[in-house]
Each structure stands twice: as C-alpha cells, then as structure tokens.
Amino acid sequence: MKLKELLAPLDVCELHADPERDITGISYDSRTTQPGELFVAVTGFAADGHKFIPKAVERGAAAILCERAPEADVPYVVVGSTRRALALVSAAWFGHPADHMTMIGVTGTNGKTTSTYLLKHILEQTLGAKVGLVGTIQNMIGDEVLETERTTPESYELQKLFAEMYAAGCTHVIMEVSSHALTLDRVAGVHFAVGFFTNLTEDHLDFHKDMEDYCDAKGKLFGICDTGCVNADDPWTPRLVKDATCRLLRYSAKAAADLTAEHIALHSDGVEFDAVSGGERAHVRLGIPGAFTVYNALGVIQAAQALGLPLEKIAAALSTAKGVKGRAEVVPTPGKDYTVLIDYSHTPDSLENILKTVRGFCRGHVIAVFGCGGDRDPFKRPIMGGIAARLADVAVVTSDNPRTEDPNEIIRQIVAGMDGAKTPPTVIENRPKAIEWAMDHAEPGDVIVLCGKGHETYQEIGHEKRHLDEREVVASYLERTL
C-alpha cells in the first residue's frame, strides 16, 4: 500500500517522506518491526515510542509516524496524536472493515459483558446473523472463540480482528467499549450504528482523575454513533449525554421512558417484566437472576429496537438466552445442601448487586468471599468492605489479583471499612484456602458467593499469571471431603 493511502485520513502536520513510497505493514512495537513497515511512535504509560525509533530504523522501518521530528535520518511524518493516528492508519491498512458491518458499542461500569452476549443471541436468533463479539471474557467470530486480555484491544489488533470478522462473513459486531479505549483513541475511526450505556459507578479511578472524568470518557461513545440508548435511572446519564451528537433513546425501570419495564418480578432463577415501548408491549422472561438483569435486558432490547427489530421477536429471543460464564454462575456442588456462585463483582456497585440478589432468595446465610485487585483504584477497597459487612452474614476477605502490591496491605484497607459487620470478617490471604474455609463452614441453605474473579482462570501475583480456576478449587474440595 502507498504511504499516501495510509495518510489520507490523518491531519498531517509535517510530511518528510515520499507519499508514493510502498509500505509493507504497520508496527508500533520496535521489537517486531519488519523491513518496509511504517513505525508508529506511540506514547504509552510506561514508555515513549519515540525512544524506540532508532531500533525500528535498525530493523528496517520504511518511515516513521511521530509527534516530533526524530533524530534518526529516516523519512517521517508528524501528526498531533500518534495514538489516534495508529487507529486511523490501521483501519486504512485493513480496508476499513468496520464500515462494512453494523457496529454496536456497549459502555458502562457493570453489565457490559452480559449485555453483549444477550444482544449477540438476539441477533443470531431473529436475523440468523453471523455476529462478531469483542469483550472481556473472549472475542468471538460467530461461534469461534478467541481468548482476550483486555476489554478493548489496541487499535491495530482491533482493526485486524474486524478484518477477520468481515472476511468470515460477520454482518454485525458487538463491542464492549471501555473508558480506556475511548480515552486512548483505540476506537478512533470506528462509527457505531448503536451505542448503549448500562450504568456508571466507582471504578478505574487509578486511570481517571475523578468520577466526572470517568463519566466524560464514557460519554465520548455518543459522539461516534447514530443512536444512543441510555439508562434514564442512572444519576450520571445527564452528564454522560451532554455533548452527544446522536439520536438519544432512554430506558427505565422506574418511570415512563422510550422503553419502560413494568410489573417486574424477581425470582431465584431469573426475572420477568413487561417491556413497554410506544404502542408495543411484550412479556420478557430471562433466566438470569437479579434486579440489575432488568436493566441489562432493557438496554439490550432498546439497542435491538434501534436496529429495527420488533419488540415481540426480541422478547422471544431473550427467553432462550443463557447466562454468561462468571456472572452469577452456579457451580455444581453434588452431595451438598449449599450453593456456590461465581461472579465477576469487582466494583462496589457490582458487589452490592450480587449480594442483594443472593439475599433475595437465600434460605440460609450469605457467605461472601472477596478481595480487591492490586495496582488499581484503592479508594473502592474500604467501600467494598463496608458493602460486604452490611449485606453478607459472613465475609471472608482474601486476595484477588494483588499484582505488584502487598496482598495483606490490600486486605487491611478492605477491613478498615468493615466496622459494624454482623460477624468479624475472616481474613485468609490464600484464595483457594479462603474458598475451602467457606465450604467447610457452610450450612444447608447457605449461599457462598465467590466475588471478583468471574471468568478468570488465573491469579496475577507480581508480574506473573498463575493458574487459578475457582471451579476447580470447588470440585477438588468436594472430591476430598465427600
């Protein structure tokens, strides 16, 4: 591809390269740069890509895309933001694949993963569509599963994934769009037919300076979509949409809106309600428990409506939808009279939601096993401790993903918020042992909620990912004790 074709979507500040030059690929990691490639010097959190220009040149880079003139004697192009430029040249390199598919973006603190899976199911059931999914647990091309390491991949990998989806026959793509991705321009150049917002609660304050900054980052989605579907019951919504340029639709479980849930019934095995939208009404039954499921369902229904699907067909498809791995997932406990749930509740709001849901159907004690991640927002630790103290009968504080922090210091910060607990918290830093302790002390009718890991099958300790699948911990305990 000619350099000028890659530069076409950019606002170029300085051009010191032959626009007719052939480019053989794009690289933003000097360690993997190949001869003839365009090297994009991206400024990262830990390192500035401009420092690695000499290495990229040494490896044969044909030209450099940068924010300031390099010292090396090499053809270069200066732009205002290489992060944004990486997204745009990557889209051009792969032939703008997102332009050929219907793109749906989901943002919010909690509920994104469940919402994407539900919407994927609806589109497959009602349209027979082949749907791509970009998410926390995994990426999917139709039924093919691809493992993933972050909610939204770096822009080059994202465009490559879109190209693979389009080549495989996908007509729709549903993405979890994180605040990081919006802030760091990973989705620059992608236009969404529909964007929808689940909720906003405290999280990622290690990255965003405050909740207002976090909200504003999420709100960027509604400047790059045609229709936005937003939660009218969330107090952050007015700020979120203040700069929206798209058509806005609102959904609510409390008051009249473009889509409203009426006659809500919460059950131990799911929820049901009447969805009302203009002159349409349909009964919705979804086999995922919790009041938060009503909101996830409303957002998904409204997004599907925005794509032109009738309410009755959407409701029928939802009735056959299954739960998502690591989201209120019931773990088999044969021979035991108690229940074990695994849930990805790693924020104050999600922890409160799952514990309230469990308390609504639990016949015995609610036992919460939880911790907080290291190298992440420390302010939520005592808050989550207070939530567990208030809503759990027994709280077992343990290690989550401590990363480079001292796990015992994280636990100390959690316990600092647990004054007034029904019983003093039990502290067991070793997570498998904490799970076993909970199972040792569970009585008939109790529900043990393993919070924070969800779909993850590893624990991050230091810079290492160590295998830890809570399902295996439960199964191993049962094998030894039955």
Q: What do these predicted ranges mean?
A:
Residues M1-C13, P35-L38, K51, R84, ...:
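ATP-dependent carboxylate-amine ligase
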Residues D73-T82, L146-E149, T245-R250:
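Active-site regions of enzymes building and remodeling cell-envelope glycoconjugates
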Residues A72-D73, M140-V145, E202-F207, R376, ...:
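A short acidic, helix-capping loop that chelates divalent metal ions and anchors anionic groups
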Residues L7-L10, L86-G228, A232, W236-A244, ...:
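Phosphate-binding loop of NTP-binding sites
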Residues C66-A69, V177, N199, A232, ...:
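Short secondary-structure boundary segments
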Residues L3, L7-P9, E67-D73, A168, ...:
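Acidic, Mg2+-coordinating active-site environments of NTP-dependent enzymes
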Residues M1-L88, G223, T227, A257, ...:
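N-terminal leader/targeting and accessory segments in enzymes
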Residues A62-R68, G228-A232, V369-F370, D393-N401:
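Short internal beta-strands
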